[in-house]
A protein has these predicted regions:
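Accessory, often N-terminal, substrate/partner-engagement and coupling regions
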Residues: 92, 117-123
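C-terminal-of-GTPase-core extension/linker across diverse P-loop GTPases
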Residues: 1-25, 30, 97-102, 109-112, ...
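Hydrophobic alpha-helical bundles that form the membrane domains of multi-pass transporters
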Residues: 56, 60-81, 86-101, 105-109, ...
Length: 451
């Protein structure tokens, strides 16, 4: 299912980021921050009262010197309107109601989405400042005094947010492979979906997906049953601004959440961009099976016999953090390699859901440690007592060892590579959890590596 999206909106210096950090750091159990995409902490997968949602802080958008504050606020509001299921508008009780507040509130009202007004910096517990009441002039039904610094009122705020969200699960047939098609604007996401539909006539139906404006398209063909989620509803505006890129990322995150396989589309005529890495990084950290799909190969001019291999090496370097992801060159326009892509989707999905019996796993471990002796330090050598698989999607293995600090990064990578080679898991992320054991007891120390 797709997690609901909650956006935090407000003019600079009203405490948006402080509120975001307070919710994520203390009031909410963070499921996982989004590495790569969120170096400035704009996204967090969060949980409150047993419900999960994606929290988005639009505060990272800063106006350029030539932009006015109202233009900045309009951009923030538009992002919230386009992506969120519920909006928290933050204002500053100390500064009172401003023209910028009124301007963005007017835009938000037109969205017809649930809006909660969080009046920040009400720091005295049990006291309602008189200045609070002027914010009722904005016309919102829910006006809540909070203190993002001290956490006052944030629990009530989250209760109000969750009351507006739909947490019902979208049921997907278990035998269908949910596939997210993600990428920058104009890389050919919609064209790829249309090509798949055009070549494979056994279409079940088109359904409006729960992902924001995305379309779920179930497809049956000789390669299996799929449900493709195309985020092609996002179209490039006059300029790719920082705000628009954030908008694109939020849309992509929602599609990735409900997928098992993520197709990261890249435009062969443009090449790699930082935004490609950001979107791919989120899919990687969610443990999805990923495929780097280089589209528009037919439009690349001056190709020679080694052009594809040279470009493959270049993309492999750009996406080095997910070296397991296969790279395939296609043309959605001509159909080149599209059927091969469908088979590849099945292969990576199968690997992502694979299970390895504990006995077979430890036979492999014995061979691996005999081939390359575990590292030692100051006369003490690492001993891996045994390996077991804890879960799938992605395959997650637990290693019980005598001393966690002896299990060096390089040797962890060696063991993971042995798992890949021995069990045909070359094209899925693998997580290795290290638990320290002493005197027959499982220690409290734990470490995790994902690759």
């Amino acid at each position: 299912m797709s997690k609901p999206i909650v956006a935090v909106v407000g003019r600079p210096n009203v405490g948006k980021s402080t509120l975001f950090n307070k919710l994520c750091g203390q009031r909410l159990a963070i499921v996982e921050d989004t590495p790569g995409i969120t170096r400035d902490r704009i996204f967090a997968n969060c949980e409150w009262s047993g419900h999960e949602f994606l929290l988005v802080d639009t505060g990272g958008i800063e106006p350029k010197a030539t932009e006015g504050i109202l233009a900045h606020m309009r951009e923030q509001a538009q992002i919230a309107i386009d992506t969120a299921d519920c909006i928290i508008m933050v204002v500053d009780v100390r500064n009172g109601l401003t023209a910028a507040d009124e301007d963005v509130a007017h835009m938000l009202r037109r969205s017809h989405k649930p809006i909660i007004l969080a009046v920040n910096k009400c720091d005295n517990v049990g006291e309602t400042p008189m200045e609070l009441y002027e914010f009722y002039n904005l016309g919102f039904d829910e006006v809540m005094p909070i203190s993002s610094v001290h956490g006052h009122g944030t629990g009530d705020l989250l209760d109000a947010v969750c009351a507006h969200l739909d947490f019902s699960e979208t049921v997907v047939e278990e035998d269908r492979i949910p596939v997210a098609i993600i990428g920058r604007p104009n890389v050919g996401k919609s064209s790829l979906t249309n090509r798949i539909l055009g070549e494979n006539r056994m279409i079940v139906a088109n359904e409006a997906g729960t992902t924001r404006d995305a379309i779920d398209t179930p497809v049956d063909n000789a390669y299996g049953k799929f449900i493709f989620t195309d985020t092609a509803g996002l179209r490039k505006r006059s300029n790719i601004t920082d705000g628009l890129e954030r908008y694109m990322v939020v849309r992509a995150l929602a599609a990735v959440e409900r997928s098992r396989v993520a197709l990261i589309l890249v435009d062969a005529t443009v090449g790699f961009t930082e935004q490609d890495s950001k979107v791919a990084g989120y899919a990687h950290d969610q443990g999805k099976a990923c495929i780097i799909v280089v589209n528009k190969w037919d439009a690349v001019e001056g190709k020679e016999t080694n052009t594809m291999e040279l470009q493959r090496r270049g993309y492999a370097e750009c996406f080095s953090f997910m070296g397991y992801a296969p790279i395939i060159f296609i043309s959605a326009q001509t159909g080149y390699n599209v059927n091969k892509l469908l088979q590849l989707i099945r292969d990576v999905d199968s690997q992502n859901g694979a299970r390895v019996p504990t006995g077979v796993l430890n036979e492999m471990l014995a061979r691996a440690t005999a081939r390359m002796q575990p590292p030692s330090d100051k006369g003490r050598r690492l001993k891996i007592f045994y390996l077991t698989q804890a879960s799938t999607r992605p395959p997650t293995f637990v290693a019980f060892v005598n001393a966690k600090h002896l299990f060096h990064f390089s040797y962890q990578r060696y063991i993971i590579n042995q798992i890949r080679e021995n069990f045909g898991l070359e094209h899925t992320p693998i997580r290795l959890v290290v638990r320290e054991r002493g005197s027959g007891e499982v220690g409290a120390k734990e470490d995790r590596k994902s690759t």
